[in-house]
A protein has these predicted regions:
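Short beta-strand scaffold positions
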Residues: 26-27, 90, 111-112
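Generic beta-sheet signal
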Residues: 106-115
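Phosphate-handling substructures
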Residues: 41-94
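Domain-level recognition of soluble alpha/beta enzyme cores
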Residues: 125-155
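Glycine-rich phosphate-binding loop signature in dinucleotide/nucleotide-binding domains
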Residues: 17-20, 99-107
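Short, active-site-adjacent cap segments at secondary-structure transitions
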Residues: 32-33, 116-118
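Active-site-proximal alpha-helix that buttresses catalytic centers in soluble enzyme cores
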Residues: 1-47, 83-86, 140
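Acidic, His/Gly-rich catalytic cores of divalent-metal-dependent hydrolytic chemistry
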Residues: 156-175
Length: 175
């Protein structure tokens, strides 16, 4: 893990350590697991990985501001070999609903990626779009609390983020 990754993991632990956490779920990608690993160890919990929480398959055209705008304007658009926003959203909501069903009245942590999280936020608030996505990919780690009653979102609060000079800003500057 890089020094920056270690600092990110410490930030997550510092935020969570006074909470009661029942379970940790995560994308199987190493960087997401590393970000929540220190907190999971603190709570003596295993990290349950779920392939559906992974990042979007980017395909042949890569990631640039124009492609971000195109994908968010048409959630069904995807380049060859890549996933659309709708595809990512479907698998993430399926995973989230299963996690919520298995953890009724429990406090859980989900470690995932910018696009994956953005599709979840868009599912519950369709005004969440490309500019919101670009904002949060510059804020990793980004801690947001979502409160559910069953599978219904009843509350949302941003708690913590680390603002970084990341690709979203660079891409936005290259409009």
């Amino acid at each position: 893990m890089t020094e920056e990754g270690k600092k990110d993991s410490e930030i997550v632990l510092e935020f969570l350590k006074d909470k009661k956490i029942d379970a940790f779920y995560c994308s199987p990608y190493k960087r997401s697991m590393d970000t929540i690993a220190e907190a999971a160890a603190f709570f003596t919990k295993e990290i349950i990985t779920d392939e559906r929480l992974r990042e979007r398959e980017k395909g042949s055209d890569g990631n640039n501001h124009g492609m971000f705008q195109k994908r968010w304007a048409d959630h069904d658009y995807h380049e060859e070999g890549g996933e659309s926003i709708a595809m990512v959203q479907n698998r993430n909501i399926e995973a989230l609903n299963e996690i919520l069903s298995d953890n009724t009245d429990k406090e859980i942590v989900i470690g995932t990626h910018g696009t994956a999280l953005s599709t979840i936020l868009n599912f519950y608030d369709n005004s969440f779009g490309c500019e919101d996505f670009l904002r949060i990919i510059d804020w990793m780690p980004y801690i947001i609390e979502l409160d559910f009653e069953g599978d219904k979102l009843v509350g949302k609060q941003e708690h913590c983020h680390v603002e970084k000079e990341f690709k979203g800003k660079q891409r936005a500057d290259k409009k």
